Regions:
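Membrane-interface segments of envelope glycosyltransferases acting on lipid-linked substrates or membrane lipids
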Residues: 1-206
């Protein structure tokens, strides 16, 4: 319930003495805009992706959440882009450059020990690949905005010349069935492995 959630958040802000409201995503940005109106606190949102593309393939969500997010982004005081390109995109759409900042996604370079070795991990996710295979991989939600279909098409082209190539796709989403069908259509369903949602990312990236 939107009104109940807003009332609860307003009470939290007043009781706990917060100084700033930070949000990201359509629903979070909408709530932050409403909270700013109710509390007068400054707001900042982190923009991770092109908000006009976030709901590709979902017309109803694009009409509702996409529109809400577009309006809310204009109401919030400050915006953080996760890359220089994202900041430039927002500036090109009329957002005030004086209220835009780039803060890059953090990377942890601490050495990590994977739970499984290469061969064991491949077996656990159903990928058929021996020591002579070169495995490319991606971990992402299977959503139209990620355009995994282009990756599969590119892989199919490369596989014709390099038959030892394999593709490991980790992630879940509404495009799963379509992407599996595409791999079959291109004749690489045995070489493309869909691992689904994974929690052991250390073994995946290793």
């Amino acid at each position: 319930n939107l009104l109940a959630a807003l009332k609860k958040l307003v009470a939290m802000v007043k009781t706990d003495g917060y100084d700033i409201i930070h949000s990201h995503g359509a629903r979070g940005n909408m709530m932050a805009a409403l909270l700013a109106h109710k509390t007068g606190l400054p707001t900042v949102t982190t923009v991770h992706s092109d908000y006009r593309l976030d709901y590709l393939g979902r017309p109803l969500s694009r009409l509702t959440y996409g529109t809400i997010n577009t309006l809310a982004l204009r109401k919030l005081k400050y915006r953080i882009g996760v890359s220089d390109a994202m900041v430039d995109l927002l500036i090109s759409r009329g957002f005030d450059p004086e209220r835009l900042f780039a803060i890059y996604n953090g990377l942890d370079f601490t050495p990590r020990t994977p739970a499984m070795g290469r061969d064991d991990y491949f077996r656990s996710v159903g990928l058929e690949a021996d020591d002579t295979c070169v495995v490319a991989g991606i971990a992402a939600r299977l959503n139209p905005v990620k355009d995994i279909a282009t990756l599969i098409r590119g892989f199919a082209l490369a596989h014709k010349d390099f038959p030892k190539l394999r593709l490991l796709i980790a992630g879940d989403g509404e495009e799963m069935d379509n992407l599996k069908a595409l791999a079959a259509e291109l004749g690489v369903s045995k070489e493309v492995c869909f691992a689904g949602w994974i929690s052991d990312t250390d073994s995946f990236y290793h």
